[in-house]
């Protein structure tokens, strides 16, 4: 990174003005690909050694690719054939994938340097541990959402027009050749001439798979543009102006989170004061779904809904259905988020109070944030993975019957432990037990099918030790965590336990 910084700061010019020359540096592609170039030399109609180092991307090869992209641009548009997929004997997809990887590395450099410089401004860079965990979101929800009144469930809209993405990047990157190459790249890739949809559907599956890094960067740029208003509103919600406010940027590996305590200063005070910034709304997002919760009234949420609709229609130039934003009262609503069905449960309780000779009962209601497993979508995921049918009845896994018995048991056991690990924060464990039952019986059916016998006969032959693979690891972890407590293990196992080492959602619940 220091090498990039020195290159970008040559001549005292701004960093974002000199991104295009970096596309011709070989070490850019060495960063993009840790492994060598696993492509036959015949792809280039020339030996790889002539292009540069053996099994490496070279600046000479990159120059030729970009030159051919520009030269063939008019030919491609004149032919206008959607099935045409090659540049005069060269694989078109490979050209685009190679350029996109280099572009992704280069375009992230200004943002990486900006983030590093913002961290270096502080005297001490705090070591945030486990803050990148997905489960850290639920800790925030438990602390904040239980005391709020209304919640708005939002699906971030799509599609985003191609030129709008270019305009968003143009605000941050002033290197015209880089933006021009990106525009050319989009217009040519699979003959895209209308829209790029920021979603995981069939039309963009190929693009998001072949150009995952560029796809994530563009998606984050679009989301940051949508969320930029929150920085202004959070500043405005404070009575005194903050001396500093961190940028609202999302990164794959972020270094910290916004704090609720802001240090402020004012001429009327001799010392800096700590102002608790308790805004009128709380905002949480994961992928394409976001949650806004407020302590205010229903009218306030309706104003927010109107604002978002106007923002998407006027700024991003596309129509967004009002039905994509739902406003509900927290006490009567459950929302899906990160594979959990979350809600606020009101727990009534009575307390006896005595004053002098009179005693009376005081009825109180305590809100508690509940997180349940969304069992129906989870069973649907298991059914698509061929572990059960749509009714939740376990079935065998035919594609694994060629594996050894130990490998089959290990795969089922590892999957069961991962799901138990992720859903350990569930308030009620009945759904988790059902999922483990499906996986255990599916494992038994798979082994019985492999050995051409019945499940009953197979289980009688193996005995009770067969299912230890599905229990022992989790029980050991829990016993180590809760060894110092005086409560029995089975009682504490019913309580939510958030593991802060989970950085991605389980593959089986990616659709939520």
UniProtKB/Swiss-Prot annotation:
Principal localisation: plastid
Main function: Usually encoded in the trnK tRNA gene intron. Probably assists in splicing its own and other chloroplast group II introns.
Keyword DNA-binding: no
Species, as recorded: Wolffiella gladiata
This protein's name: Maturase K
InterPro entries: Domain_X, Maturase_MatK, Maturase_MatK_N
Keywords for the protein's UniProt record, in alphabetical order: Chloroplast, mRNA processing, Plastid, RNA-binding, tRNA processing
HAMAP family linked: MatK (MF_01390)
Localization, UniProt: Plastid, Chloroplast
GO biological process: mRNA processing; RNA splicing; tRNA processing
Key word ATP-binding present: no
Record's GO cellular component terms: chloroplast
Single GO MF descriptor: RNA binding
Matches recorded under Pfam families: Intron_maturas2 (PF01348), MatK_N (PF01824)
Family that this chain belongs to: Belongs to the intron maturase 2 family. MatK subfamily.
């Amino acid at each position: 990174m220091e090498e990039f910084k020195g290159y970008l700061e040559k001549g005292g010019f701004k960093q974002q003005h000199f991104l295009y020359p970096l596309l011709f540096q070989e070490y850019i592609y060495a960063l993009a690909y840790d492994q060598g170039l696993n492509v036959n030399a015949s792809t280039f109609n020339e030996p790889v050694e002539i292009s540069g180092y053996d099994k490496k991307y070279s600046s000479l090869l990159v120059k030729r690719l970009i030159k051919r992209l520009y030269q063939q641009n008019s030919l491609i548009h004149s032919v206008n054939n959607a099935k045409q997929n090659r540049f005069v004997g060269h694989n078109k997809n490979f050209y685009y994938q190679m350029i996109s990887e280099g572009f992704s590395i280069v375009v992230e450099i200004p943002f990486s340097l900006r983030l590093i410089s913002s961290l270096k401004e502080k005297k001490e860079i705090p070591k945030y541990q486990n803050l990148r965990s997905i489960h850290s979101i639920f800790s925030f929800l438990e602390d904040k959402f239980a005391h709020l009144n209304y919640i708005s469930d939002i699906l971030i809209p799509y599609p985003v027009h191609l030129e709008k993405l270019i305009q968003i990047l143009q605000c941050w990157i002033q290197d015209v050749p880089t933006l021009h190459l990106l525009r050319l790249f989009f217009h040519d890739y699979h003959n895209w001439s209308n829209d790029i949809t920021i979603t995981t559907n069939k039309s963009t599956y190929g693009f998001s798979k072949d150009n995952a890094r560029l796809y994530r960067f563009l998606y984050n740029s679009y989301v940051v543009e949508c969320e930029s208003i929150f920085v202004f509103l959070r500043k405005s919600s404070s009575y005194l102006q903050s001396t500093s406010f961190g940028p609202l940027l999302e990164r794959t590996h972020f270094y910290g989170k916004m704090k609720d305590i802001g240090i402020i200063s004012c001429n009327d005070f001799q010392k800096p004061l700590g102002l608790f910034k308790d805004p009128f709304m709380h905002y949480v997002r994961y992928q394409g779904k976001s949650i806004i919760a407020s302590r205010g009234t229903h009218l306030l949420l309706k104003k927010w809904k109107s604002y978002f609709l106007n923002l998407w229609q006027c700024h991003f130039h596309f129509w967004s259905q009002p039905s994509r934003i739902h406003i509900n009262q927290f006490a009567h609503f459950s929302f899906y988020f990160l594979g959990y069905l979350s809600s606020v449960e009101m727990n009534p309780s009575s307390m006896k109070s005595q004053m002098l000779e009179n005693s009376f009962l005081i009825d109180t209601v305590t809100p508690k944030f509940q997180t349940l497993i969304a069992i129906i979508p989870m069973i649907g995921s298991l059914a698509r993975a061929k572990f059960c049918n749509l009714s939740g009845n376990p079935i065998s896994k035919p594609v694994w019957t060629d594996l050894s018995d130990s490998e089959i048991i290990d795969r089922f056991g590892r999957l069961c432990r991962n799901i138990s690990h992720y859903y350990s924060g569930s308030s009620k464990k009945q759904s988790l037990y059902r999922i483990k039952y499906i996986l255990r019986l599916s494992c038994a059916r798979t082994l019985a099918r492999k050995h051409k016998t019945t499940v009953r006969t197979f289980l009688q032959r193996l005995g009770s030790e067969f299912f230890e693979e599905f229990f022992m690891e989790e029980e050991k972890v829990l016993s180590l965590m809760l060894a110092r407590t005086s409560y029995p293990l089975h009682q504490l196992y019913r309580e939510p336990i958030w593991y802060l080492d989970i950085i991605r959602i389980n593959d089986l619940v990616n659709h939520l």
